[in-house]
């Protein structure tokens, strides 16, 4: 873990959590299963402690003097806070935020820890940016104003520098019929009272819920979903009736040398069971309106998706670097065919970087004054990553040859009777033989292990899979044949608009104005 050093000046209030404070907060009586074991304290159990320590390292990064200007900012009251809570209100602000997001990924294994608190909490911007529709469009609140609770939750999270892990995915119902959704065990409201709503059911996937301070509940709209299943809000993991059931762990606890990435911990995707759990009204963000939920499968996660593109860019840089290092060590780098193959990684990185920069350059201002990157740019950038990552993973392993698969353990390397033979096998034109082991271990952990395969699967379905990215993103801009996107084609073809004078009614324009204002397309403000 990192050494924590106080970096604030004597009169400056410092409100940034330390790793020690984070770890202490995890021992709160939450019910967590990992595989067949009931874990009493996720900060100390061998299957969970490594990841808890990695998140603690995330917090301690904010206390490094050399990173103060990158990791923290002074708010309007002169309080130094984590950049997690920085609301970017200009393009320059967004670039500062991106530098922060990149730094976190670079310092924590180049993408080995995808769901850090900075990305988990980024989602909350959607609510606080424009809270009114979340309240006014709710059904079943008896006229209660939910906006105060939404804004208060942001303040509680910010002031405590906490971590809210999203839980949005419902069980896979029989998708051959829409009516099956209503019969699924998905989380639903079973009662309302003056205190709040009582919920019962399941959220089938939540990444890192065992390690969060709060569980951020939401829903991805599906045809056939019923009003009782539309719930957005927050509960603490130790709330009575909440059980977190994690899959089997892939962590290589205590094997930092042999498994430099897998030893950093496993995020542990989980099922969360809610058995008659009370959510107070001040932690309810929205309930009861499937039409409202249908507008937000992507929009509520826009900030997470922008982050996932930044993370993909960092991972592409790591892959390019690994390809350069391993081919240099085995002596194939100078071969023209090999350099042509390495160029694919360079192109992959530059294309992702272009999507990031273009999304930032063509950004817009949301209703709450947040400067937001171009939605089409970062979502189709995510699609590009998913379309190409599998092929490039195979390319990297193929360029590595046996170096990624057959190499000695550290214990074998340290045996004097074996070292001369093993060193000869790892000797190339440049570099030390032991360095090749270090490169090979990273390639193996990231791309040839259960731990690495889990991250690859996560990235393919993070937020939305490829088909959903394409279909949902097409609904985020004017893509109808009668819309403006076809104006140039109509002009070149000499075709008049079929709608006559005035603005054509299209599927996109039929969406609620408050939702389209989160997209930033040129016609949204009309």
Predicted regions and their residues:
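A structural signal for well-ordered alpha-helices, especially hydrophobic packing surfaces
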Residues: 56-59, 327, 349, 353-356, ...
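FAD-binding core of flavoproteins
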Residues: 166-311, 478-524
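Alpha-helix capping/hinge segments and adjacent helical runs
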Residues: 376-523
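Acidic/polar, glycine-rich intrinsically disordered N-terminal extensions of enzymes
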Residues: 9-73
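Generic structural signal for well-ordered, non-transmembrane alpha-helical segments
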Residues: 49, 53, 155-158, 198, ...
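Short, charged, amphipathic alpha-helical segments
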Residues: 336-343, 371-379
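Extended amphipathic alpha-helical segments enriched in small hydrophobics
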Residues: 307-365
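Glycine-rich flavin
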Residues: 73-214, 221-233, 243
